[in-house]
């Protein structure tokens, strides 16, 4: 039986150089190879013309460059493109390309499904299947870059920003997320600025501390409620890591981070008559008073079977004004791609192999009662 080949998309530069040392080659050869893979999108060793033939043959014998395939895509009227990415065994994740006038952001998944069971998120309703590998994470960027034409003129803006805000909780897959983000930041990888790579978390505090020791990227935190009582319902991981513990972890992270410029991005989904009253806005402002931040208010994007509705524009406006009275920077996020279910909270994935999934959790089965504001 032949030995399984090493997928080079699984290796950050440190691991790539270790491989080349094992091959008896100098470190700069690893850097050359990474440029071919990530700057030019080349997966055939024979096309790497500044690498000698003997080394190309060695690489072909032991290694491969394999990214997950795009199995389908939909394009929104606003230019957003949602990709279904096949990651094997009948499994798919979703990756979303969001073009704007001055940038193009790719929203990347870190897991197949999600275990956190946030009650307003469609991905959470599926349960959790597995973590994505490094190659499956960076492969989303690599494959979509191919779709966009890499350096060629295709009419689409090249990817300038990456947000780990797709399917899954990135901090529950640190072993793969950290080297994947290393590749995103590496000059010989995707060469993105650390301020253009954002990780979003719902608050796995010990893993947030580990991230801070390993990497410096922009941080977005999913708060979604101004107190523990409501957040226990909306974001159940709060029962393990309550708000004050989460906020302390956030402050530790931004204290050692340059990417965040001294403040964190707070994400707050606006749920009609659930978390959007003016009283709750005052409560949120008081909650965040010791944590430098800007606040993204996210209009809820309904999905089939969702027990929640989207806050009205007038309620969002009142909520926003209260926060600004406290001196907070507030942005009301423009909904993108909701006509193709690509908006925030709508990534569900067409996953056919569900044998390892948790049973679906439905709000109506839990008999959760939330006080109407």
Curated annotation (Swiss-Prot):
Keyword annotations: 4Fe-4S, Cytoplasm, Disulfide bond, Iron, Iron-sulfur, Metal-binding, Methyltransferase, rRNA processing, S-adenosyl-L-methionine, Transferase, tRNA processing
Reaction equations catalysed: adenosine(2503) in 23S rRNA + 2 reduced [2Fe-2S]-[ferredoxin] + 2 S-adenosyl-L-methionine = 2-methyladenosine(2503) in 23S rRNA + 5'-deoxyadenosine + L-methionine + 2 oxidized [2Fe-2S]-[ferredoxin] + S-adenosyl-L-homocysteine; adenosine(37) in tRNA + 2 reduced [2Fe-2S]-[ferredoxin] + 2 S-adenosyl-L-methionine = 2-methyladenosine(37) in tRNA + 5'-deoxyadenosine + L-methionine + 2 oxidized [2Fe-2S]-[ferredoxin] + S-adenosyl-L-homocysteine
Main location per the UniProt record: cytoplasm
Subcellular localization, as worded in the UniProt entry: Cytoplasm
BP GO annotations: rRNA base methylation; tRNA methylation
Cofactor(s) needed for function: [4Fe-4S] cluster
Binding site for [4Fe-4S] cluster: 114, 118, 121
GO cellular component, one term: cytoplasm
Cofactor binding description: Binds 1 [4Fe-4S] cluster. The cluster is coordinated with 3 cysteines and an exchangeable S-adenosyl-L-methionine.
Extra information: Reaction proceeds by a ping-pong mechanism involving intermediate methylation of a conserved cysteine residue.
Protein name in the entry: Dual-specificity RNA methyltransferase RlmN
Gene name in the database record: rlmN
């Amino acid at each position: 039986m032949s030995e399984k080949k090493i997928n080079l998309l699984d290796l950050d530069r440190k691991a790539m150089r270790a491989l080349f040392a094992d091959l008896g080659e100098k470190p700069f050869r690893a850097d050359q190879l990474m440029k071919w893979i990530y700057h030019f999108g080349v997966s055939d060793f024979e096309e790497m013309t500044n690498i000698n033939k003997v080394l190309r043959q060695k690489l072909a014998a032991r290694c491969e460059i394999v990214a997950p395939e795009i199995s389908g895509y939909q394009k929104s009227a606003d230019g957003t493109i949602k990709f279904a990415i096949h990651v094997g065994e009948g499994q798919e994740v979703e990756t979303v390309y969001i073009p704007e006038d001055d940038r193009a952001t790719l929203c990347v998944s870190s897991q197949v499904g999600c275990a956190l069971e946030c009650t307003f998120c469609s991905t959470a309703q599926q349960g959790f299947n597995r973590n994505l590998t490094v190659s499956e994470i960076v492969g989303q960027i690599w494959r979509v870059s191919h779709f966009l034409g890499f350096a060629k003129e295709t009419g689409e803006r090249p990817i300038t920003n990456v947000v780990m805000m797709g399917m899954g909780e990135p901090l529950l897959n640190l072993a793969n997320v950290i080297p994947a983000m290393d590749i995103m930041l590496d000059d010989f990888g995707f060469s993105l600025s650390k301020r253009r790579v954002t990780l979003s978390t719902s608050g796995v505090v010990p893993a947030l501390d580990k991230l801070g020791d390993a990497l410096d990227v922009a941080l977005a935190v999913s708060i979604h409620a101004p107190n523990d009582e409501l957040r226990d319902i909306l974001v159940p991981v709060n029962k393990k890591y309550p708000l004050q513990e989460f906020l302390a972890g956030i402050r530790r992270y931004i204290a050692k981070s340059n990417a965040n410029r001294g403040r964190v991005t707070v994400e707050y989904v606006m749920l009609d008559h659930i978390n959007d009253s003016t009283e709750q806005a005052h409560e949120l402002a008081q909650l965040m008073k010791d944590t430098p931040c800007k606040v993204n208010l996210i209009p809820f994007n309904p999905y089939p079977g969702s027990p929640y509705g989207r806050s009205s524009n007038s309620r969002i406006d009142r909520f926003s004004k209260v926060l600004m009275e406290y001196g907070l920077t507030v942005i009301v996020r423009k909904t993108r791609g909701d006509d193709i279910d690509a908006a925030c909270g709508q990534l569900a994935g067409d996953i056919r192999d569900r044998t390892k999934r948790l049973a679906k959790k439905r709000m109506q089965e839990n008999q959760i009662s939330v006080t109407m504001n």
